């Protein structure tokens, strides 16, 4: 079991740095791998959802936020996902 979380952490770090540099394509590539290697990596999930949102991919963002809400109920991460998801749903409805 240790290899997955370690790989996840590396992909998360690379992906999060890409996200902060507004390179959302690289962020999505790395963060997608981070959540595959460790499904419990809440930060990677949230950054992935945010990367989709920032690259105007509302559909994937909403899917990712839904997954966070399902995986981590009653957490601050899920509450953040719910807020972003609500904003997107409103924007998409307009």
What role is predicted for each listed range?
Residues 20-21, 54, 71, 87-91:
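Register position in tetratricopeptide repeats
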Residues 33-36, 70-73:
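Conserved structural position within tetratricopeptide repeats
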Residues 6-9, 43, 76-80:
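Start-of-helix register in tetratricopeptide repeats
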């Amino acid at each position: 079991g240790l290899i997955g979380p370690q790989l996840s952490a590396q992909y998360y770090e690379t992906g999060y740095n890409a996200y902060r540099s507004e390179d959302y394509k690289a962020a999505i590539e790395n963060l997608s791998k981070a959540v595959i290697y460790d499904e419990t990596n809440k930060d990677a999930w949230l950054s992935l959802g945010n990367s989709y949102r920032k690259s105007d991919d509302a559909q994937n963002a909403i899917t990712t936020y839904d997954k966070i809400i399902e995986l981590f109920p009653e957490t601050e991460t899920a509450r953040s996902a719910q807020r972003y998801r609500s904003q997107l749903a409103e924007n998409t409805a307009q």
